[in-house]
Curated annotation (Swiss-Prot):
GO biological process: prostaglandin metabolic process
UniProt keywords, alphabetically: Cytoplasm, Lipid metabolism, NADP, Oxidoreductase
First-level EC class: oxidoreductase
Protein name, per record: Prostaglandin reductase 2
This protein's encoding gene: PTGR2
Catalyzed chemical reaction(s): 13,14-dihydro-15-oxo-prostaglandin E2 + NAD(+) = 15-oxoprostaglandin E2 + NADH + H(+); 13,14-dihydro-15-oxo-prostaglandin E2 + NADP(+) = 15-oxoprostaglandin E2 + NADPH + H(+); 13,14-dihydro-15-oxo-PGF2alpha + NADP(+) = 15-oxoprostaglandin F2alpha + NADPH + H(+); 13,14-dihydro-15-oxo-prostaglandin E1 + NADP(+) = 15-oxoprostaglandin E1 + NADPH + H(+)
Domain of life (superkingdom): Eukaryota
Length: 351
């Protein structure tokens, strides 16, 4: 059987911006036989995420993710349906997910890298397992719980940068659910600002491309900032940190503004900002959700419950077709998405 896959065509260079042409689609032959312990899956949805930018370099600069290889199939978060199984834990028709799903229309995988998912948890929206009821949701929930130090009733103000993205859009809502009295988002378009305040219940939103961010932040957070969910790093974060309170907390989720630069992760703060951080005893610890696997099961159930109760609003930007994986990745890296960027490979769940 001939199937399509996406391979890494070229590297953007450590300081380069990724483009769709860094990827290419090719046809390959899928083996006819599924061996013991393997399953054949049809890919339904694939995820593109900021961390993947590091995988485009020869060296990811990280000890927990490996680089993609030139002319080899690219992989990441995926959801699909099992067409044939020779693994004891799975049967034909099961829906499964993996963090290491090849960008391929159909593929034979080792069953041990897969996890079964229950469509009822997401009311049939299987792509949510790649977003709010998946790794971005867990990153937001566990990050806020473990590093945010939110105490209900203590009038804390939370600021979220990259607030209209996959993690940011969830983190702000979770901050409110856990007890923050004021939540302010920072994003890059008027449309995103409106989305945050009218659909997600943020108290206010700042478009960092318009006006003075420091002045707007001062006006919208008169009592200062207690919790900062940092998705972007760079100048925006320096501005927020300078308005943070004594003994406040930074949740270091991502540094997308720095991903096309050859700097360590997390990037060091400028000396003046670092001085503020130390003087005010602001915590800024690297946060890696994979260190909290023991909390995943409960976390998924909590996120699903909030979603079903209407307390957690979920937004996706969906593109169709494996051939658009590169374009979807490029768009996501430049803020083209609201909520989670997803690529639909096949909407067909019949067998």
């Amino acid at each position: 059987m001939i199937v399509q896959r996406v391979v890494l065509n070229s590297r953007p260079g450590k300081n380069g911006h990724p483009v769709a042409e860094n990827f290419r689609v090719e046809e390959v032959n899928l083996p006819d036989c599924v061996n013991e312990g393997q399953v054949q899956v049809r890919t339904l949805y694939l995820s593109v995420d900021p961390y993947m930018r590091c995988r485009m370099n020869e060296d990811t600069g990280s000890d927990y993710i490996t680089p993609w290889q030139l002319s080899q199939v690219v992989d990441g978060g995926g959801v699909g349906i099992i067409e044939e199984s020779k693994h004891t834990n799975f049967m034909k028709g099961d829906f499964v997910t993996s963090f290491y799903w090849p960008w391929q229309t159909k593929v034979i995988l080792d069953g041990n890298i897969l996890e079964k998912v229950d469509p009822q948890l997401v009311d049939g929206h299987l792509s949510y397992f790649l977003g709010a009821i998946g790794m971005p949701g867990l990153t937001s929930l566990i990050g806020v719980q473990e590093k945010g130090h939110i105490t209900a009733g203590s009038n804390q103000t939370m600021v979220v940068s990259g607030a209209a993205g996959a993690c940011g859009s969830l983190a702000g809502q979770i901050g409110r659910l856990l007890g923050c009295s004021r939540v302010v988002g920072i994003c890059g378009t008027p449309e995103k600002c409106l989305f945050l305040t009218s659909e997600l219940g943020f108290d206010a939103a700042i478009n960092y491309k318009e006006g003075n961010v420091a002045e707007q932040l001062h006006k919208l957070c008169p009592a200062g900032v207690d919790v900062y969910f940092d998705n972007v790093g760079g100048d925006i974060s320096d501005t927020v940190i300078s308005q943070m309170n004594q003994n406040s907390h930074i949740i270091l989720c991502g540094q997308i503004s720095q991903y096309n630069k050859d700097v360590p992760y997390p990037p060091p703060l400028p000396p003046a900002i670092e001085a503020i951080q130390k003087e005010r005893n602001i915590t800024r610890e690297r946060f890696l959700v994979l260190n909290y696997k023991d909390k995943f099961e409960f976390g998924i159930l909590q996120l699903s419950q909030w979603f079903k109760e209407g307390k957690l609003k979920i937004k996706e930007t969906m593109i169709n077709g494996l051939e658009n994986m590169g374009a979807a990745f490029q768009s996501m890296m430049t803020g083209g998405n609201i909520g989670k960027q997803i690529v639909c490979i096949s909407g067909d769940t019949s067998l």
